[in-house]
């Protein structure tokens, strides 16, 4: 591996390997870990779940003897989120540093990575039943207007389109307003993460072909059967669809919502390509917010 540009000094105490889906992040991170004595912290919103293997590209053999963290840490009964990730990633980072190894964050979930790099203030906020009762009956537009009155940043703008998430955002904004010292307490206990950030990128047409070939390989290896098995274990179609992409389209295909295998493969392929574009957009936004990404064109 060519590490000529990789200069880890006192300025950096960790590495981030990011990129769109199918850019080879895990393989690259494993190579770095072997060269630099590192351990990998996964930043993938679905690889945290046990049982989501083929659909998430969770190839544990690829890690070899390189230690990895935040993979297979919870079951599908639980909704894992960015707050959980930030806390778990902090713990993994400190554990790795205590053992004098190099933490390497690797993944494509931009929200998760951004929460570490730009230090989102994610505070444990209890439910406010009184506030929820006062807002009951308001429609989405009214809740959005109410939220904007707090004048606080929204890290994930899709939360504005979901009633439950928007209600939670209002709850958090109200808590911060009434507990102004909460963020200071959080920041005082936050580990000092100063990563060198490496971004992997392929030309568009090559990336699309990599996505296509990988999808066909996953289907051949049993991704449809994996999804069917999860449903037989008791997980609803709705839960599987909520996981997005591979599990969403495969669940729809198994239910007969997608009529043919050809339509299933084509629809899923196009959705993954669109997802890759959204990931690239997220990383560009991170750069606009001052995050320095060292891009490696593959």
UniProtKB/Swiss-Prot annotation:
EC number assigned by the record: 2.5.1.75
Catalytic activity field: adenosine(37) in tRNA + dimethylallyl diphosphate = N(6)-dimethylallyladenosine(37) in tRNA + diphosphate
Positions with a binding annotation for substrate: 21-26
InterPro entries xrefs: Dimethylallyltransferase (IPR039657), IPT (IPR018022), P-loop_NTPase (IPR027417)
Example of a GO MF term: tRNA dimethylallyltransferase activity
Subunit structure comment from the entry: Monomer.
Tree of life domain: Bacteria
Gene behind the chain: miaA2
Biological processes, Gene Ontology terms: tRNA modification
Assigned protein family: Belongs to the IPP transferase family.
Annotated segments matching region Interaction with substrate tRNA: 44-47
Name of the protein in question: tRNA dimethylallyltransferase 2
Binding annotation for ATP: 19-26
Site feature Interaction with substrate tRNA, where: 109
One Pfam match: IPPT
Keywords for this protein: ATP-binding, Magnesium, Nucleotide-binding, Transferase, tRNA processing
PANTHER family, per database record: TRNA DIMETHYLALLYLTRANSFERASE
Cofactor needs: Mg(2+)
HAMAP family to which the protein is assigned, alphabetical: IPP_trans
Organism: Treponema denticola (strain ATCC 35405 / DSM 14222 / CIP 103919 / JCM 8153 / KCTC 15104)
Function: Catalyzes the transfer of a dimethylallyl group onto the adenine at position 37 in tRNAs that read codons beginning with uridine, leading to the formation of N6-(dimethylallyl)adenosine (i(6)A).
């Amino acid at each position: 591996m060519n590490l000529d540009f990789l200069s880890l000094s006192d300025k950096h105490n960790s590495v981030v390997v990011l990129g769109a889906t199918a850019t080879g992040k895990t393989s690259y991170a494993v190579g770095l870990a072997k060269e630099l004595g590192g351990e990998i912290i996964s930043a993938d919103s679905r690889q945290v779940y046990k049982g989501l293997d083929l659909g998430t590209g969770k190839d544990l053999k690829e890690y070899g003897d390189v230690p990895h963290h935040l993979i297979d840490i919870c079951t599908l009964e639980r909704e894992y989120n960015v707050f959980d990730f930030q806390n778990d990633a902090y713990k993994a980072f400190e554990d790795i540093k205590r053992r004098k190894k190099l933490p390497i964050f690797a993944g494509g979930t931009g929200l998760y990575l951004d929460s570490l790099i730009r230090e989102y203030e994610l505070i444990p906020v209890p439910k406010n039943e009184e506030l929820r009762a006062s807002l009951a009956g308001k429609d989405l537009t009214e809740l959005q207007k109410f939220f904007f009155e707090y004048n606080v940043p929204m890290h994930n703008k899709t939360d504005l389109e979901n009633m439950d998430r928007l209600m939670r955002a209002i709850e958090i904004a109200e808590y911060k307003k009434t507990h102004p010292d909460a963020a200071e307490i959080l920041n005082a206990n936050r580990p000092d993460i100063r990563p060198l950030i490496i971004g992997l990128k392929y030309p568009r047409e090559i990336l699309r072909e990599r996505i296509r070939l990988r999808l066909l390989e996953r289907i051949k290896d049993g991704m449809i059967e994996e999804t069917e098995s999860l449903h037989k274990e008791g997980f609803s179609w709705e839960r599987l669809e909520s996981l997005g992409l591979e599990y969403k389209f495969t669940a729809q295909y198994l239910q007969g919502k997608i009529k043919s295998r050809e339509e299933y493969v084509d629809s899923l392929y196009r959705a993954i390509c669109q997802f890759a574009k959204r990931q690239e957009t997220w990383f560009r936004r991170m750069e606009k917010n001052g995050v320095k990404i060292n891009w490696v064109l593959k």
